[in-house]
């Protein structure tokens, strides 16, 4: 709640910190942990590929808060850049995202108040990471759909330029027509 006014007034820049070196955002490979100690939380781990990280003054850090029978629970914490034990590190070069600078962070016994928890305990993966994965999947699918549409148009052009279509070609043109309707229906 302390950060909300600054966020709404544009005084804070925030960076989501999920991905880790060698793990990406895969939940089984993440290792950053948050340990509760009374009214405080102690964070240890590393994060990477932090979009706008060099500009951020607040990090939303997803960390493991429980593990039972191989299943991990993740919680997100608001961590100020000025926190003792938070070190900005270099990130791999991401040339295609040049307008958005990237960095990594190393967390060594970073202490924040437990009230810096964002959302319910153990719900960060479902509330934050899964929706982000869906957006990433959708963005990846658009590239494939665009390429598919381009190839489809080339195929249609080639098929309609045949002077004397055979019965086999007419069948192929019919299938192309059905594909065109299906692609149109899904917005490709």
Predicted regions and their residues:
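Glycine-rich beta->alpha junctions and the first turn(s) of the following alpha-helix
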Residues: 89-181
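Buried hydrophobic positions in well-ordered alpha/beta secondary-structure cores of metabolic enzymes
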Residues: 16, 34, 43-45, 61, ...
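Long, low-complexity C-terminal extensions of enzymes
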Residues: 182-188
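A generic structural signal for beta-strand entry/edge sites
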Residues: 38-42, 58, 102
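Glycine-rich flavin
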Residues: 1-51
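Short loop segments at secondary-structure junctions
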Residues: 37-39, 64-68, 81-84, 108-116
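A short core secondary-structure module
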Residues: 46-86
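A generic structural signal for well-ordered coil/turn residues at beta-strand boundaries
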Residues: 12, 28-30, 55-57, 73, ...
């Amino acid at each position: 709640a302390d950060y909300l006014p600054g966020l709404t007034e544009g005084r804070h820049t925030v960076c989501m910190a999920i991905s880790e070196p060698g793990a990406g955002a895969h939940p089984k490979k993440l290792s950053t942990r948050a340990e509760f100690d009374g009214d405080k939380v102690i964070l240890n781990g590393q994060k990477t590929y932090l979009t706008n990280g060099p500009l951020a003054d607040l990090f939303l850090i997803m960390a493991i808060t429980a593990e039972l029978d191989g299943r991990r629970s993740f919680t997100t914490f608001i961590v100020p850049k000025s926190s003792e034990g938070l070190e900005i590190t270099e990130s791999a070069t991401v040339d295609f995202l040049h307008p958005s600078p990237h960095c990594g962070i190393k967390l060594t016994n970073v202490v924040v108040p437990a009230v810096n928890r964002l959302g319910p305990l153990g719900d960060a993966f479902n509330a934050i990471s899964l929706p982000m994965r869906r957006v990433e999947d959708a963005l990846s699918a658009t590239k494939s759909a665009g390429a598919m549409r381009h190839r489809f148009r080339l195929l249609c052009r080639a098929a309609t330029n045949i002077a004397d279509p055979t019965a086999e070609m007419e069948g192929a043109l019919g299938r192309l027509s059905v594909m065109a309707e299906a692609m149109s229906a899904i917005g490709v």
